[in-house]
Amino acid sequence: DGFECNVLQERQCIEAMQCMAKLHMAMRHLQTQQPYQADRLLEDFKRKDAELVRARNFMRRLSRKDEFTLMFLRAYERYWQQTKLAQSFLDAACLQALERKQLTEEMYVHGDMNQHNIIMLQGKVMTFRNFEKLGAHLQMKDVYFFMRKILEKNHWSVALADQMIESYAAITPVEHA
């Protein structure tokens, strides 16, 4: 019997990152029945932008606005500007280079990497479950989702973040993910 990765046990989180790095190495150039189809990163950014605009427009049209809606609308512009600034750093050429890298290395991701899908067996050995969202993407996507979940629960510990990245990078250099 196994148990889920405990987000408050730093050692388990670090070991989970090592296992994720090994999984990512194994998930490159998988032999599948379907041709490899990389995500289009530029299209993904545009889709996320459109979702944010739709959410804002929906909330603007509400006749009765609760406290959360009012706070969201007040904060929206500031976050929207930060989104645009972040996107300006990732110009089209940079994103196209990432897409080429993804296609060349045929990277796959778990797609739903969180503590609930990382199972500890006999203390240290781990396995992963729930691969329903497995797909072609930059593997940093899994790293991001897992780290965000863990760091939220650990008060955004910079020391833990450093250890997690170092443990992943010891197996799969971050620039290759």
Which residues does each PLM region occupy?
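ATP-binding pocket architecture of kinase catalytic cores
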Residues: 1-35
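ATP-dependent phospho-/nucleotidyl transfer catalytic cores
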Residues: 3-8, 33-108
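Short alpha-helix boundary/capping segments
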Residues: 7-15, 135, 152-156
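Charged catalytic carboxylate motif
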Residues: 15, 19, 78, 142, ...
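Gram-positive cell-envelope targeting signals
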Residues: 21-24, 64, 79, 100, ...
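Active-site acidic catalytic loop and adjacent metal/ATP-binding pocket
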Residues: 88-143
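Active-site activation/catalytic loop segments of kinase-like enzymes and analogous catalytic loops
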Residues: 140-173
